[in-house]
C-alpha cells in the first residue's frame, strides 16, 4: 500500500496500529530475536544504503555513510541487546516495587536529509526493541534511500516473526502529510530543522525533538596540539560535516594560536585568505541560515562554489574571524567542512567567546575543550559549568563523541540527540529505547520499619542509686556536671550523689538553677559553665524540666555551633527530617536520675523547652538526646508533694494512653503502655494519699512512669499533648494538669470508626481506636459489653481518678479567666494543630475540632 494522500495515510496507520497491537504481546525473547536479525540486515545492507543516500541527496561521503550505517546496526544492538524492554523489567520484593515496560504505540519518525539511512536504521531498531510500530516520514530529497532502509529492516523483522506492516512509510512526503502523521501517531521522534521540531511539539501529541548544533571548541595552551587538531579534522570531515554535533568554531588561546594554525595547515586544512573571506561568507550563508547547497559537500567543492582555488586534497576550510555576532556567517552552524577560528587573549576570553557562540545558536547541544585533564582541571571544570550544553566533550572529536560509545563508553549510541530544556527539548541526553516506553510502577503496600530505642542501661529498684553510679568508675569517668533545681538540692539528693562521686574519685560541679520549666536562657547560661568545666559526664537530677534542660545542654556543649531554631524544626517522619541532630557522646555521656514519677523523660528522646523571648514551648525530639543511662530509684521519690504526685502521675497515664493509641504503636510498646496504665490506676491514689510512707506505691509508680516513657519514646504522643503544651504555655498551667484537663475530651474525639480525617500514614490497616481504648478497659477489668461501653467506662475511670487526686474538672476551674481563654483560643488551636505530637494521633484533627475540644474542656461541669 502506497501512501501519498491523507486517506492512504489513515489506512496505513490503521494497519500499523493493528500490527503493533499484536507486537505488544510478544515476549522479550521474541523481541530480542527480531531486534538482532534486523540489526544484522542493516549491517549487511550498509554499503547499498550508503550509496543510495549519497546518490539521492548529493550529500556526504559513501565511505562515511557506510560507517554510520554499520554503527547504527552494530553499536545500537550491542548497547541494548540485553536491556529488558518487555513486561516486568524490575522487581524489588523487599520494597514491594515492580516496574513493567509497555510500548507507546506507533512512532512517527521524521528523517533528515543529512543522515537518512543511518537514522532510519536507528529509529527502526529502538522501536522494534520496545514493541512499537514505526511510521516514517522521509525528507523529500531522501525518500528513496529512507524507504529502502525501512524496507530492509521490515523484511528482516517480519522474517524473524514480527507482524507484517509493523514498519511503514510515506511514499510521497509533504509538509501536509508529515504534520498529519504527527497528529495521529502516539509519539514523534523528530530529527530535522527547527521549524520541523517546532511543528512536532505543536502537534498535540508527545514528541522527542532535537535542536540545532553550533559546537564551539576551545584549544587551551595545555592541550596536546597535534591530537586536538587531528581530532577536530577527523570530526569535521566525517561525512563532510553533516553531523549536527560537529565543531563549528575553534577558539585558540593567543599563546599557541600560530602553532595551532600551522598544525591545521600541516594536516590539510586551508586557511582562507582575508580577501577570500567574503566570497566564502556569501556561499555558506543564505537568507539568514546555512546555504543548503553546501551541506555535506567537500571543502574543495565549497571553495570552488566561492571561486577560490584550493588543492583537491583540502580537508577543511578555516576562516579566521573576530565577530561573534549574528551577522557573521562563520559564527553559525555550517553542516560542512567549514570551520571558524577565533583567537582568544586568555582562557577567560576564550570562555566568553564560547558562551556567546552557544547563545547565538546551539543551546543545549554540544561543546568541547582540548586541555590537559590533570594540569588544567580547573579550566575544564569552569568550561563545563559555563556551557549550557548537555554534551560537553574533553579531548574528544565531537561528531564521534556525540554519536556515543566512542572515546567515552558511557555515552549511549544514538542518532537522535536531545538538547534538554536549553534547546527546547524534554530530553537532555542521547535518545534510546527507554524514551519509547511507558514504565508502569506497581507499588505494593509496605509498612515503615519501626524501632525500639531506650537508654543503653536502665537501672531500677528502691535504693539502686549508689550501685548504678558505680558504672561511671568502670567507664573511667573523671568529671561530672550535675543539672538540677532547688528542690532535690535542698532535699539532700545532690549530697547523696556527691558522696558517691567523691568515693569514685570523680570531680563534680553543680548547677542548681533550673526553674519550673526548662527555658533557653537558663540552658545557655548553664552550658557556658559546663563548657568551662569540661565534664565527661552530665547528670540530670529531677523531673521533666531538669531532664529537658540537661538534654539541650548536652547538645549545645558538644556542638556550640547549632541553632535552637534548627533543633526546633518540626518533622513528619523522624527519619526524614530536614535538620539532622548532630551526633552526641564524643565529649560526655548523659545520666538521667529521675526524682518524680511522671513524663518518663529519663528514657525518652524528648525535651520540652520554653523560648524566653516568645514564651512558646517547643517539644524537641531526636534519639540523639536519649540518655545513655537512666536510674529509677523510688527512694528519691518518697518526699514528693501530693500535688506533684497527682499531676505527674496523670501525665504518665496520658503518656501511656496516647502511646497505646498512637499511629506508631507496636507490639514492643503496647505491653509497656498497658501495664503502665494498670499500675497507675492501681497505685497512684495510694501514692497520692500515703506516698511518704508507702514504699510499694512509690516504686510501682516509678516503674509505671518509666515504662510509659519507653512506650511514648518509641510510639510517640498524640493530640492531648499537642493541646496541653499550648494550653500550658499560654495560661501558665503545669503540663500534667493540662493533660488531665484534656484527655477525656480527646478520647471522645478519637473514639470513632469513621473519622473525618485519618492520620496521614498510620501503622494500622484501618481506624480501630475504639477497639484500642476498649482493650485498655479490658486490661484494667472495667467490664462492659460493647467496645463503646468500654470506652465510656474508661473515661469515667479517668474522671474518678482525677477526682480522687483533686485535679480541677475544667480549664476554667484551673484558674483561666474566660476573657483570656477566648482571646487566645484561635491562636493556640492553630499551634496545637501544628505541634510535633499531632501527627501521631490516631485521628487527624481539623483546627475547628481542636477549638471545639478546648471550649468543651473550658466549660466542663464536675
Curated annotation (Swiss-Prot):
Gene3D superfamilies: 3.40.50.1970, Aldehyde Dehydrogenase, Chain A, domain 1 (3.40.605.10), Aldehyde Dehydrogenase, Chain A, domain 2 (3.40.309.10), Dehydroquinate synthase-like - alpha domain (1.20.1090.10). It is an enzyme of class 1 (oxidoreductase). It catalyses: a primary alcohol + NAD(+) = an aldehyde + NADH + H(+); a secondary alcohol + NAD(+) = a ketone + NADH + H(+); an aldehyde + NAD(+) + H2O = a carboxylate + NADH + 2 H(+). It comes from the Bacteria. The keyword Flavoprotein does not apply. GO terms for cellular component: cytosol. Its EC number is 1.1.1.1, 1.2.1.3. Keywords: Multifunctional enzyme, NAD, Oxidoreductase, Plasmid. InterPro entries: AAD_C (IPR034789), ADH_Fe/GldA (IPR001670), ADH_Fe_C (IPR056798), ADH_Fe_CS (IPR018211), Ald_DH/histidinol_DH (IPR016161), Ald_DH_C (IPR016163), Ald_DH_N (IPR016162), Aldehyde_DH_dom (IPR015590). NAD(+) binds at residues 420-425. GO terms for biological process: alcohol metabolic process; carbon utilization. The active site is at residue 244. Induction: Induced during switch to solvent production. GO terms for molecular function: acetaldehyde dehydrogenase (acetylating) activity; alcohol dehydrogenase (NAD+) activity; alcohol dehydrogenase (NADP+) activity; aldehyde dehydrogenase (NAD+) activity; butanol dehydrogenase (NAD+) activity; metal ion binding; methylglyoxal reductase (NADPH) (acetol producing) activity. Pfam families: ADH_Fe_C, Aldedh, Fe-ADH. PROSITE patterns: ADH_IRON_1 (PS00913). In the N-terminal section; belongs to the aldehyde dehydrogenase family. In the C-terminal section; belongs to the iron-containing alcohol dehydrogenase family. Has both aldehyde and alcohol dehydrogenase activities. Can use acetaldehyde, butyraldehyde, butanol and ethanol. This is Aldehyde-alcohol dehydrogenase. It comes from Clostridium acetobutylicum (strain ATCC 824 / DSM 792 / JCM 1419 / IAM 19013 / LMG 5710 / NBRC 13948 / NRRL B-527 / VKM B-1787 / 2291 / W).
Amino acid at each position: 500500500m502506497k501512501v501519498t494522500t491523507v486517506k492512504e495515510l489513515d489506512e496505513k496507520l490503521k494497519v500499523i496500529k493493528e500490527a503493533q497491537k499484536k507486537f505488544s504481546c510478544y515476549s522479550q525473547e521474541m523481541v530480542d530475536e527480531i531486534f538482532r536479525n534486523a540489526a544484522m540486515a542493516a549491517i549487511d545492507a550498509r554499503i547499498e544504503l550508503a550509496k543510495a543516500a549519497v546518490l539521492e541527496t548529493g550529500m556526504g561521503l559513501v565511505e562515511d555513510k557506510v560507517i554510520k550505517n554499520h554503527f547504527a546496526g552494530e553499536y545500537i544492538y550491542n548497547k541494548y541487546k540485553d536491556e529488558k524492554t518487555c513486561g516486568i523489567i524490575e522487581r524489588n520484593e523487599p520494597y514491594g516495587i515492580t516496574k513493567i515496560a509497555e510500548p507507546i504505540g506507533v512512532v512517527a519518525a521524521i528523517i533528515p536529509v543529512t543522515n537518512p539511512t543511518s537514522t532510519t536504521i536507528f529509529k527502526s531498531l529502538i522501536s522494534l526493541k520496545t514493541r512499537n510500530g514505526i511510521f516514517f516520514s522521509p525528507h523529500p530529497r531522501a525518500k528513496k534511500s529512507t524507504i529502502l532502509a525501512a524496507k530492509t529492516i521490515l523484511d528482516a523483522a517480519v522474517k524473524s516473526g514480527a507482524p507484517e506492516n509493523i514498519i511503514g512509510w510515506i511514499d510521497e512526503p509533504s509538509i501536509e502529510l508529515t504534520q498529519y502523521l504527527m497528529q495521529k501517531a502516539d509519539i514523534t521522534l523528530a530529527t530535522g530543522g527547527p521549524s520541523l521540531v517546532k511543528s512536532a511539539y505543536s502537534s498535540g501529541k508527545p514528541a522527542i525533538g532535537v535542536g540545532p548544533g553550533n559546537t564551539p571548541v576551545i584549544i587551551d595552551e595545555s592541550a596536546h596540539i597535534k591530537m586536538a587538531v587531528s581530532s577536530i579534522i577527523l570530526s569535521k570531515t566525517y561525512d563532510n560535516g553533516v553531523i549536527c554535533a560537529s565543531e563549528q568554531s575553534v577558539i585558540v588561546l593567543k599563546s599557541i594560536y600560530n602553532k595551532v594554525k600551522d598544525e591545521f595547515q600541516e594536516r590539510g586544512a586551508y586557511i582562507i585568505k582575508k580577501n577570500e573571506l567574503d566570497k566564502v561568507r556569501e556561499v555558506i550563508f543564505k537568507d539568514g541560515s546555512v546555504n543548503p547547497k553546501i551541506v555535506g559537500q567537500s571543502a574543495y567543492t565549497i571553495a570552488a562554489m566561492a571561486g577560490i582555488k584550493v588543492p583537491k586534497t583540502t580537508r577543511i576550510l578555516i576562516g579566521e574571524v573576530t565577530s561573534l555576532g549574528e551577522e557573521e556567517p562563520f559564527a553559525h552552524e555550517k553542516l560542512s567542512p567549514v570551520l571558524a577560528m577565533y583567537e582568544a587573549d586568555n582562557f577567560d576570553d576564550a570562555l566568553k567567546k564560547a558562551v556567546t557562540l552557544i547563545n547565538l545558536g546551539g543551546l543545549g547541544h554540544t561543546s568541547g575543550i582540548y586541555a590537559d585533564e590533570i594540569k588544567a582541571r580547573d579550566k575544564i571544570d569552569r568550561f563545563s559549568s559555563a556551557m549550557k550544553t548537555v554534551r560537553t566533550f574533553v579531548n574528544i572529536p565531537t561528531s564521534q563523541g556525540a554519536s556515543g560509545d566512542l572515546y567515552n563508553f558511557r555515552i549511549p549510541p544514538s542518532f537522535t540527540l536531545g538538547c534538554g530544556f536549553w534547546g527546547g527539548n524534554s530530553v537532555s541526553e542521547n535518545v534510546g529505547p527507554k524514551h519509547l516506553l511507558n514504565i508502569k510502577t506497581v507499588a505494593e503496600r509496605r509498612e515503615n520499619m519501626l524501632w525500639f530505642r531506650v537508654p543503653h542501661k536502665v537501672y531500677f529498684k528502691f535504693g539502686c542509686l549508689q550501685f548504678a553510679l558505680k558504672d561511671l568508675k568502670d567507664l573511667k569517668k573523671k568529671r561530672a556536671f550535675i543539672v538540677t533545681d532547688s528542690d532535690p538540692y535542698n532535699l539532700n539528693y545532690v549530697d547523696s550523689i556527691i558522696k558517691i562521686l567523691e568515693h569514685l574519685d570523680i570531680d563534680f560541679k553543680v548547677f542548681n538553677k533550673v526553674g519550673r520549666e526548662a527555658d533557653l536562657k537558663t540552658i545557655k547560661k548553664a552550658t557556658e559553665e559546663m563548657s568551662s568545666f569540661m565534664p565527661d559526664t552530665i547528670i540530670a537530677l529531677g523531673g521533666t524540666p531538669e531532664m529537658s534542660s540537661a538534654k539541650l545542654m548536652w547538645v549545645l556543649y558538644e556542638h556550640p555551633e547549632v541553632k535552637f531554631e534548627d533543633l526546633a524544626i518540626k518533622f513528619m517522619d523522624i527519619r526524614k527530617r530536614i535538620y539532622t541532630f548532630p551526633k552526641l557522646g564524643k565529649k560526655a555521656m548523659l545520666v538521667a536520675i529521675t526524682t518524680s514519677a511522671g513524663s518518663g523523660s529519663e528514657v525518652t528522646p524528648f525535651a520540652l523547652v520554653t523560648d524566653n523571648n516568645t514564651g512558646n514551648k517547643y517539644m524537641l525530639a531526636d534519639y540523639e538526646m536519649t540518655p545513655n543511662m537512666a536510674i529509677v530509684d523510688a527512694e528519691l521519690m518518697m518526699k514528693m508533694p501530693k500535688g506533684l504526685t497527682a499531676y505527674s502521675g496523670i501525665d504518665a497515664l496520658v503518656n501511656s494512653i496516647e502511646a497505646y493509641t498512637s499511629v506508631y504503636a507496636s507490639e514492643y510498646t503496647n505491653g509497656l503502655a498497658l501495664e503502665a496504665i494498670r499500675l497507675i490506676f492501681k497505685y497512684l491514689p495510694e501514692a497520692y494519699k500515703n506516698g511518704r510512707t508507702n514504699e510499694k506505691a512509690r516504686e510501682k509508680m516509678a516503674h509505671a512512669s518509666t515504662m510509659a516513657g519507653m512506650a511514648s519514646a518509641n510510639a510517640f504522643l498524640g493530640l492531648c499533648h499537642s493541646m496541653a503544651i499550648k494550653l500550658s504555655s499560654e495560661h501558665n498551667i503545669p503540663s500534667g494538669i493540662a493533660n488531665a484537663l484534656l484527655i477525656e475530651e480527646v478520647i471522645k474525639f478519637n473514639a470513632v470508626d469513621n473519622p473525618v480525617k485519618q492520620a496521614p500514614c498510620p501503622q494500622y490497616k484501618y481506624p480501630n481506636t475504639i477497639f484500642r481504648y476498649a482493650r485498655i478497659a479490658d486490661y484494667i477489668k472495667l467490664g462492659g459489653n460493647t467496645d463503646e461501653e468500654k470506652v465510656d467506662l474508661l473515661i469515667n475511670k479517668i474522671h474518678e481518678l482525677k477526682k480522687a487526686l483533686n485535679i480541677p474538672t475544667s480549664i476554667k476551674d484551673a484558674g483561666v479567666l474566660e476573657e483570656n481563654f477566648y482571646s487566645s483560643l484561635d491562636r493556640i488551636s492553630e499551634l496545637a494543630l501544628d505541634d510535633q505530637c499531632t501527627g501521631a494521633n490516631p485521628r487527624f484533627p481539623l483546627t475547628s475540632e481542636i477549638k471545639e475540644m478546648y471550649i468543651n474542656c473550658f466549660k466542663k461541669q464536675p
